[in-house]
Amino acid sequence: MPELPEVETIRRAVGPQVRGKRIIHTNVRATKLRHPLPPELDRLLVGQLIVAMDRRGKYLLLRCKGGTIIFHLGMTGMLYLVKASSPHGKHDHLDLVLDGSYILRFTDPRRFGTIIWTDNDPLQHPLLVAHGPEPLEAEFSASYLYLKRHRRKIPIKQLIMDSRVVAGIGNIYANESLFRAGIAPQTSASDLSPDKDLLLVDAIKGVLTDAVEAGTSNIESALTGERPQGYFPYEFSIYGKKGRPCPKCGSAIRMMRLGGRSTFFCPLCQK
């Protein structure tokens, strides 16, 4: 599932290329996504001038002169540029044909993605208004985390995946951040010691920064006009590595289900 680093990489790759372009046509091939596409989408979008592409948590905001298209990539979604002559595939559900030689294409094999148009402030949309701070911004600090977690008797992993607490952290990077911080994912949020607040905040910022930088170094692949083969290769320390040796101590990485999600941890390094 694309999380904050993958979404930020798309923003950095695609945003500068579409800024200043006008939507001259749309091709809608499937309307039944997580939220059904409005039948008047073509009328709303044709003629719109794109002014910026922003990100909020895991959402992409394609800001136009008259409103904003809100994208969520779901489990398998991708937003990328293709050449105007590029044939569409089975799972390419929306094309925004731009003036010039490119199409902004949304593909989503499992159809859990979201495409919504709003002519109001997108940050006040029901999908976004309750989001907590961005994890890479100064507002997300050790003192902030303490205020949000010290009375919560839920596993710390579930807390940091709550977008109302902090925006954009999904299962993959929650696993990676807790491993870097040396904190067991099942630890009750209320039981975390104050010194661990700083460790965890620093770990989250570090893991996400490393992943974004890995994506930025591979950003050219999003601009070739060819169908992408997947997201950038970021070398995970622990996610998806059940039974393999811990990169810190060599003991076997374990997996459990926590909040219905696969959770990977080292029983020796994470306490």
Swiss-Prot record:
One of its GO terms (molecular function) is damaged DNA binding. Transmembrane segments: none annotated. Binds 1 zinc ion per subunit. The active site is at P2, E3, K58, R261. Its EC number is 3.2.2.23, 4.2.99.18. It catalyses: Hydrolysis of DNA containing ring-opened 7-methylguanine residues, releasing 2,6-diamino-4-hydroxy-5-(N-methyl)formamidopyrimidine; 2'-deoxyribonucleotide-(2'-deoxyribose 5'-phosphate)-2'-deoxyribonucleotide-DNA = a 3'-end 2'-deoxyribonucleotide-(2,3-dehydro-2,3-deoxyribose 5'-phosphate)-DNA + a 5'-end 5'-phospho-2'-deoxyribonucleoside-DNA + H(+). Its cofactor is Zn(2+). Pfam families: Fapy_DNA_glyco, H2TH, zf-FPG_IleRS. A zinc finger (FPG-type) spans 237-271. It comes from the Bacteria. One of its GO terms (biological process) is base-excision repair. DNA binds at H91, R110, R152. Keywords: DNA damage, DNA repair, DNA-binding, Glycosidase, Hydrolase, Lyase, Metal-binding, Multifunctional enzyme, Zinc, Zinc-finger. Belongs to the FPG family. Monomer. Involved in base excision repair of DNA damaged by oxidation or by mutagenic agents. Acts as a DNA glycosylase that recognizes and removes damaged bases. Has a preference for oxidized purines, such as 7,8-dihydro-8-oxoguanine (8-oxoG). Has AP (apurinic/apyrimidinic) lyase activity and introduces nicks in the DNA strand. Cleaves the DNA backbone by beta-delta elimination to generate a single-strand break at the site of the removed base with both 3'- and 5'-phosphates. This is Formamidopyrimidine-DNA glycosylase. The lineage of its organism: Bacteria, Pseudomonadati, Thermodesulfobacteriota, Desulfuromonadia, Geobacterales. The gene is mutM.
